[in-house]
Amino acid sequence: MTDLHDVAGTALMSRPLASILINNYNYARFLDKAIDSALSQNYPTKEIIVVDDGSTDNSREIISRYGDRIIPILKENGGQASAFNAGVARCQGDILCFLDSDDFFHPDKLERVAAAFHQQGMNSRAMLVHHFLAIKSHMDNDLDGDTFGKTHDSPMNLYAFARRYRFLWNEIGPTTSISINRRLADRLFPISERARISADAFIACGASLVGEAYFLKEILGGYRVHGNNNWHGAEQRISQNYSDALQEYLNRKLVENNLAPVISFDDSIYAWPRLVSDRRWSKLAWHMLRLSALQHDRYTARFVYYTLMSIAQLGMKTVKSRTHHLGVMADRFHRW
C-alpha cells in the first residue's frame, strides 16, 4: 500500500502546469471566494479556467472583474458534465484540479497535490488524487469540525470488483477534492453530457476502473453545505436515466481501454436505492434474493441482510426517511 500522507518532503524538481477548473451555475454569492482561493495558491505555475454554465444571476459580472487573471468560458446551460468537458478541452495543464464554485481551496492545495503526483511518477500512468475537505456552512463557519472525504487503500483500482459484482461503489470524494493527471484526463474525457448534476461520479468511477486512485490524508479545501448542493446526498437520488448514462459511459471507457464492459447496474446491488425510493418492495426482495443465489458469497449475503433488516425497521416512515436510513446502513455495511 502506498502512503500519501507524508509528501511534505517530496521535492519538486520542476512544477508542471496545474489547471484549476471552476464550474459555476448561479453561485454568484460564492464565486468570488472560489476564484480568490485559486488565485491565492502558493504554487506558481497554474492557470485558472472558470466555466459559467449559462448562469442567470450576476456570475458573469463577477467573472469579468478578474480580467486576464483567469480564463473565462461563457456557455449556454448544458449541465455540470458539459461544463467539465468545456474546461478540460480548453486547459493545458499536466494536473487538472476541479473546483465547484460554492467551495474553495486551501492555499497549499496545488503544492500538495502536485507533490503527490510527483511521488507516483506524474504522468507515468493514469492517476487520480483526492483528499479531505472541511465542511463549512454558507457563512464559512465550521460545522462541528467535520470533514468530508472517502478513505481507501492506495493505489485503488476496482475493475476486479466490478467484473465480479457488475457494479462499483463511488469511493472518491466530491468534485472539489478531485485532481487527475493528463494521462487519465485523456482516457476519461469527454464524459457523457446526460449527467446534468453529480457528474463528478463519472470521473471518480471512470478513474477507479481505467486508472488508479490515491487518497491524500490532508484537508486541502472547504465544502459548503447550504441546502442546494448537488453532490451532498446525491447518491440517494439515483434515477434510471442517470444510472443508464453512467453505465453506458463506463462500459464505453472500458472497451476503449481494452477491458471487458462488465457494468450492469440493474443486475447488481447498485439498483437497491432506486427500488427503495420507488417503494418497489416485492421487486427489491426478489432482486436481492436472486443476487444472493447467483453470487454465493458473504459480501452479497451481508448486503441483503442489512438491506432487509433496514426495511423492516422503517415501518411507516416516509420514503425520504427510508432512503436516508438505508444509505446509513449501506455505508456501515460497505465499510465493514
Feature map (PLM): residue ranges:
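Nucleotide-sugar donor-binding/catalytic module of glycosyltransferases
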Residues: 2-238, 330
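C-terminal subregions of glycosyltransferases and related glycan-biosynthesis enzymes
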Residues: 3-8, 165-169, 197, 209, ...
